[in-house]
Amino acid sequence: MKIDIIISADDIKKEKILHKSVIVVDMLRATSVIITAINNGCREVIPVLTIEEALEIYHKNREKYVMGGERKALKIEGFHCSNSPLEYSRQVVENKTLVITTSNGTKAIKGSIMAKNILIGALINADEVANRSINLNNDVVIVNAGTCGQFSIDDFICSGYMINCVIKKIKVDLTDIARTALYIYEQNPDIITFIKKASHYKRIKKLKLYDDLEYCCRKDIIKIVPEYIDGIIKCNKLIY
């Protein structure tokens, strides 16, 4: 197995992901939201690029859907939930379909459709993502959502931790960028302290979303790996 990293949704190229397993990472906060929602009984998640798409789906069956997401880290007017994973409790999402649109995460997911498999990853399920990627036995590309097309420290160190989880189990080849992410994690295992330097972290902190930051920086608290297949994110727990 070989592991590579793409540093933002804007840098995804078909030839880099074709026939490979992609792990999409937007730990602050879209992939953390998706993982949490499904873990709390959400039936499935539909990621879309625009607010208009989300509203169109929602109006087809208002009882079935919950709308979530953000623009510039803020809740979208008229949506049920923001991009805070802590809002997606069992009471809110159980047996519902979540329609989500975010600035970076949903773009990274939709941009990865040429991959063989698309796994949804974050710190909160990193070790389980490592297990799933090993079982799939393909080369792996970790797609960092980034922030508005730019590199994000938070996604990068999360990728480093995922690589750390993999290399504890099997031997892998790493590209230079993947090796760099691993090195950064190994030098900074206290992730929440390290990412205080990140611009995206500072933006979320400015909004006083301290609990979100603490939650998203917890390692391996969820044991599922949602997968994006044919426009829908689900988790078949029987395969793990």
From Swiss-Prot:
Catalytically driven reaction(s): (2R)-O-phospho-3-sulfolactate + H2O = (2R)-3-sulfolactate + phosphate
InterPro entries, per the entry: ComB-like, ComB-like_sf
Any GO molecular function: sulfopyruvate decarboxylase activity
SUPFAM superfamilies: ComB-like
Cofactor(s) recorded in Swiss-Prot or TrEMBL: Mg(2+)
Entry EC number(s): 3.1.3.71
EC class (word): hydrolase
Record keywords, A-Z: Hydrolase, Magnesium
Pfam family, one: 2-ph_phosp
The family this protein is said to belong to: Belongs to the ComB family.
Protein name in UniProt: Probable 2-phosphosulfolactate phosphatase
